A protein has these predicted regions:
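Sequence-structural signature of mature extracellular/luminal beta-sheet repeat domains
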Residues: 2-354
Length: 354
């Protein structure tokens, strides 16, 4: 009987310890309460389809992972991997020694990169890496998570800092906490100064200029919306919502310079995120679980095409265990779409669906 009591006491002690852990163990976030907008996943304009079923995958057996973004220049393809390697058709072009995310070539054929670890950097034709900016000169706040960029005809580089609080790899903390730590910034190569244009963004992600460069878009991943910041005209210096209540988490965005913005959705909206938006204490409890037991993304390719007024003109999807997912960037070159992924080993390509 005494032995049974000892076992019972140990079980009770372990049970109490588990309860204390899940209810009181410190976590590195202070979640806020918010009201998630109406779930639009079942709306007709976002209806499930198989238009991305036939994505062809390239360079998936070269030993690298996470070609987040893709650029084409002089008939060559450039991709950046999670190892820091920048690869082209000719082999390894350079290595940022960080985590290259958004990329674009400037007018002098320097490859400008939003590097999540190193900041805003430039790589010349010989593969030499140069740091352009690591903080905003207007508020003196250093970058934590430089994410995406676009370059204007005058050379100015518009880019995002996803979070001024959490660095690369802490995306989940940003999602669970839900505080506006993101920024939209601009770097002027003429003055070598960086200015903050927009503060208080909920995970500032993709950045893209309009065809006439009168405005620039920045995705707010954790709010399912895209902000428009006016650069010209009477509204210059102000911002407004371009589109909101998206059916998933917007990642990168690009313009085909013919009036279409292509938006990569990392994943459809998540039931737990929806349900727990106004339950910050519950999000703390779930964060204490092993990551494998926390909400996970599904295999779902998802891309939207928007005109410059924010109207949906393309809804491209494919949900399957064989889907190329997650798609984190999409760019159009001639009549093809090129896809990047934060975690997939290869990049994808498909003809622009009609």
């Amino acid at each position: 009987m005494k032995k049974i009591n000892n076992i019972s006491n140990k079980i009770l002690f372990l049970f109490i310890a588990f309860i204390i852990y899940f209810l009181a163990w410190p976590v590195p976030i202070e979640p806020t309460s918010w009201e998630s907008p109406r779930d639009t996943r079942t709306d007709a304009e976002y209806s499930l389809n198989k238009k991305l079923k036939d994505i062809r995958i390239f360079w998936d057996n070269d030993g690298h992972t996470g070609p987040e973004d893709i650029v084409l220049k002089n008939n060559k393809i450039y991709v950046g991997y999670d190892s820091g390697v920048i690869m082209s058709n000719d082999g390894i072009f350079s290595n940022t020694k960080g985590r290259p995310l958004g990329m674009a070539f400037d007018s002098e054929e320097n490859l400008i990169i939003a590097d999540a670890v190193r900041g805003l950097i430039s790589i010349d034709r010989d593969g030499k890496v140069k740091t352009l900016s690591t903080k905003s000169d207007s508020d003196n706040i250093p970058f934590k998570f430089v994410d995406d960029l676009d370059i204007a005809n005058d050379g100015k580089i518009y880019f995002s800092d996803a979070s001024s609080k959490y660095g690369y790899g802490s995306d989940r903390l940003e999602l669970f906490e839900h505080t506006p730590n993101g920024r939209l910034l601009v770097y002027d190569p003429a003055t070598k100064e960086t200015t903050t244009l927009l503060n208080d963004l909920y995970f500032a992600n993709g950045v893209a200029l309009s065809t006439d460069e009168s405005f620039v878009l920045v995705n707010e991943t954790c709010m399912y919306r895209i902000q428009k910041y006016w650069l010209k005209g009477e509204k210059a210096g102000t911002s407004e919502v371009f589109i909101d209540n998206l059916p998933g988490f917007p990642d990168n965005v690009s313009s085909n310079k013919e009036g279409i913005f292509w938006v990569a959705l990392f994943n459809p909206r998540n039931n737990f995120v929806e349900m727990s938006s106004n339950k910050p204490f519950l999000r703390k409890i779930v964060l204490r679980l092993p990551e494998l037991l926390q909400p996970q993304p599904v295999r779902h390719s998802f891309v939207l095409g928007l005109d410059e007024s924010g109207k949906i003109v393309h809804n491209l999807q494919y949900q399957s265990n064989k889907a190329y997912s997650p798609i984190t960037s999409v760019k159009q070159y001639e009549n093809h779409l090129y896809f990047g992924s934060l975690t997939h080993p290869g990049w994808g390509k498909i003809k622009v669906p009609k």
